Amino acid sequence: EEQIEMMYQGFLKQSGVPESQIPPQLVPMVKGMFTNKPFIEGPWMDKYNGKYYLQYACPGAQFNVYADGVYIADSPLGPFSLAKNNPYSYSPGGFMPGAGHGSTMWDKHGNLWHTSTMRISVNQQFERRVGIWPAGFDKDGELFCNQRYGDWPRVVSSEKNDPWENPKWYLLSSGKPASASSFVEGKSPFLATEENAQNWWQADSAESGQWLEVDLEKAMDVYAIQINFADDKLDVPVPGEIKGTMTQPRYIDEYDRVTRWILEGSVDGENYFVIEDKSQVDTDLPHDLVVREEGLQARYIKLTILEVPFEQKPCISGLRVFGIGDGEKPEVPSFEATRSDDELDLLVNIQGENAVGYNILWGHEPEKLYHSWLVFLDRDKIYSKERIEKRIGALVKGQKYYVRVDAFNENGITEGVVIPL
């Protein structure tokens, strides 16, 4: 109690808030933040077929395992019971992991969607983006969210969609060679194809015309290119008064910034054609998606950056190319799955062939593999028979589970077999 009181008083001093301004009924809640007791935040509730689904965020926005859980009740005030399908929103792998502090809503076509925040957390602890994934209720009324390939483009039509439909286009750029006009030491072009939003290529100059190019190693059918800009220790003079509190100072920039670039493609590396020209736009999109439904043939994808906000050295965390390869899909992977002694962790050992990565799926019934972890092979291990291991701390003690491992590459997805854990 003494330690909690000290931390509480330190919080008041740091935030500049007199204790007299905190309503007495809220003091226990504020002090609760400094205990080891778990707490929930970001509550959201949906009603479906007479049941109430209380969703909440598990604290830890800076971690890849940031997630949303769900409780179910017959009344909006409870009593609530923990759903079997927890954590309901959980996307710990891939280019940009994290899926916590979210909301669930219907669109006008009857599709259910879940939005949550995704982690970057490099420049600041709460540096995040917002993701959106297909969700739904199964025949037993269980709420689910499909995040199997959660940061890949997916087709959305103006009608009822299948929330479990696999991606139409596959990732072509993972681990592929990259080159650039220049780069800062430790921020090489290769980082733009590493599938990790916490790393990025950075040009060593803020001069307009810096470029980044990805080599797919052979001409492929390209349907979409995702351009992900990053911030790198921005040092920008603040032109006005900084407001907020000591713990959350902020200045709202009302100036219209722009992000301008030209995207080109080439089959031979000598003759280039323009895919998208945004040299004159008035928009500032840090994450942009260029789609070509008809497809195009390209081996080289080149991004020339003309302008970014605050005249910074441009950074790209992912120049991600999606399409369909002309080779074979991966082999069905072999794997072993065991459970830790405390029943909270899933231990998976995988060996496959001709894969870029694997998707580990698990759930409490064989046909309800609602949870997933997307795993990429290291650049020098792609397509090899390298054995990989993954420890997943996301099981509910005492609950039965089933596991499946799928393999994927630029040519497609190969589903594995389901085994009991």
For each predicted feature, which ranges?
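Beta-rich, blade/repeat-based domains predominating
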Residues: T35-N49, F95-D107
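Blade-edge beta-strand/turn elements of extracellular beta-propeller
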Residues: E1-P38, Y71-G94, D140, F144-R148, ...
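Beta-propeller blade signature
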Residues: D68-P76, V130-D138, E264
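Beta-propeller fold recognition
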Residues: E1-Q14, V122-L172
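Recognizes extended acidic, P/S/T-rich segments that occur
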Residues: G357-G398, E410-V417
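Aromatic, loop-rich ligand-recognition surfaces of beta-strand-rich domains
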Residues: E195-V274, L285-E343, L347, E353-A355, ...
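Hydrophobic core segments of beta-strands in well-ordered, beta-rich domains
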Residues: E1, E41-G60, N111-R119
